[in-house]
Swiss-Prot record:
One of its GO terms (biological process) is aerobic respiration. HAMAP family: NDH1_NuoH (MF_01350). One of its GO terms (molecular function) is oxidoreductase activity, acting on NAD(P)H, quinone or similar compound as acceptor. It catalyses: a quinone + NADH + 5 H(+)(in) = a quinol + NAD(+) + 4 H(+)(out). This is NADH-quinone oxidoreductase subunit 8.
Length: 365
């Protein structure tokens, strides 16, 4: 089935693009505060609460501090690439969010609740996410520091291990819907049910790979403080360092919006059609989920991430892609996928609950 969508005038597209940029920058500022407060609650402490009422002006204080700190360019750095790298990271982080639909057509004051609508939207998102790593790689190369270079090389190598699984996981909804358009994927879910019910393994792979792509714990290897001092941005300070943090948080927010769009119905819900509210709640849930993971999980070693990407994410995504392709090619009932997806969930649940814990070494009390 194909759906048609009205096209907005250019001035409205430009206005919505501006709103997205301003909204993401504001969300970045306050997500730093929210994450610090939540991590503090997980760790039984207070968190930042001194600047302004309830600490709400802490992001402003952080911004002022970052802007007015000394901006150092180390002597051995390639100055042009050193300055260019954080800009590349931020630009490509911002480019993905404009495709995400937040409501049905015409629900934004008579206009469309997205910036642009591309028939090749999934390919566009995949390309933008791939290009974003150039900022990290250039920062490591241009810094002239072995720690920065190792951090950027880690990011480039790990990218290959999880991006293959992520790409194959995206093909499951594409095969079922028959479209690369994000709006088509949301509308299909409105009529047939959420895609994670038909493709739980693909949903799981995409969720994990999204954490790796956003460099969130337990996959924040490119900036492992214990091993690489500060990772690829070791030599950065002031506003340039803040730009890298901005890019990381925007990836974090974008991933939290893409997961419900692709697998959890986007702005749709079986009850109470309040699209913007449901989309906001779904995004907020995954933001909290990622912060929860950061508070409770340890960081994987570099070799563990590569083994996990090649040994679990890629085979699982490939297997589910082949299963979905077989069902679609033979025109079998889609209920087969529902049963297989439920079975895979039960297998995962059983593995989590009944896997024996390794015995402790040593004889300490």
């Amino acid at each position: 089935m194909t759906w048609s969508y009205p096209v907005d005038p250019y001035w409205m597209v430009a206005l919505k693009a501006l709103l997205v940029v301003v909204g993401l920058l504001t969300a970045f500022a306050f997500m730093t505060l929210i994450e610090r407060r939540l991590l503090a609650r997980f760790q039984v402490r207070m968190g930042p609460n001194r600047v302004g009422p309830f600490g709400l002006l802490q992001p402003l204080a952080d911004a002022i501090k970052s802007i007015f700190k000394e901006d150092i360019v180390v002597a051995q750095a390639d100055r042009f690439l050193f300055v260019l790298a954080p800009l590349i990271s931020v630009v490509f982080a911002l480019l993905a969010f404009g495709l995400i639909p937040f409501g049905p057509p015409g629900s934004f004051f008579g206009y469309q609740p997205w910036v642009i609508n591309l028939d090749l939207g999934i390919l566009y998102l995949f390309a933008v996410s791939e290009l974003a790593v150039y900022g990290i790689f250039l920062s490591g190369w241009a810094s002239g520091s072995k720690y920065s270079l190792l951090g950027s090389l880690r990011s480039s190598a790990s990218l290959i291990s999880y991006e293959l699984g992520l790409g194959l996981a995206l093909l499951a909804p594409v095969l079922l819907v028959g479209s690369l358009n994000l709006n088509d994927i949301v509308n299909w879910q409105k009529e047939h049910g959420w895609l994670f019910l038909y493709a739980f393994p693909a949903f799981l792979v995409y969720l994990i790979a999204s954490m790796a792509e956003a460099a969130r714990t337990p996959f924040d290897l490119p900036e492992a403080e214990q091993e690489l001092v500060g990772g690829y941005h070791t030599e950065y300070s002031s506003i340039k360092w803040a730009l890298f943090q901005m890019a990381e948080y925007i990836h974090f927010i974008t991933a939290s919006a893409l997961i419900p769009t692709l697998f959890l119905g986007g702005w749709t819900m079986p009850v109470l059609e309040v699209p913007y509210l449901w989309m906001f709640l779904k995004i907020a849930f995954f933001l909290f989920f990622f912060i929860w993971i950061r508070a409770t999980w340890f960081r994987l070693r570099y070799d563990q991430l590569l083994r996990f990407g090649w040994g679990f994410l890629f085979p699982l995504a490939l297997l589910w892609f082949l299963v979905t392709a077989l069902v679609v090619a033979l025109d079998l009932p889609r209920t087969y996928l529902l049963y297989l997806s439920a079975l895979s969930f039960l297998v995962l649940l059983g593995a989590v609950l009944y896997t024996p814990k390794p015995a402790r070494k040593g004889g300490g009390a």
